[in-house]
């Protein structure tokens, strides 16, 4: 098994861990509907950048 020659310092350890932090999801608000959605994703209503891309299907609950 490999063993390092000398112990890594607290500074080196911290520098290595500096990229490990988790970020929250980037959310945007659609200008047309005001819906919140993930960046670069379509909103639940089918809008992207203010234009309707898809027409949403009727949900199962609406058919009953």
Swiss-Prot record:
The keyword Acetylation does not apply. It comes from the Bacteria. One of its GO terms (molecular function) is structural constituent of ribosome. GO terms for biological process: translation. Disulfide bonds: none annotated. Residues 1-16 have a biased composition (Basic residues). GO terms for cellular component: cytosolic large ribosomal subunit. The keyword Glycosyltransferase does not apply. Residues 1-64 are annotated as: Disordered. Coiled coil: none annotated. InterPro entries: Ribosomal_bL32, Ribosomal_bL32_bact, Ribosomal_zn-bd. Keywords: Ribonucleoprotein, Ribosomal protein. Belongs to the bacterial ribosomal protein bL32 family. This is Large ribosomal subunit protein bL32. It comes from Coxiella burnetii (strain RSA 493 / Nine Mile phase I). The lineage of its organism: Bacteria, Pseudomonadati, Pseudomonadota, Gammaproteobacteria, Legionellales.
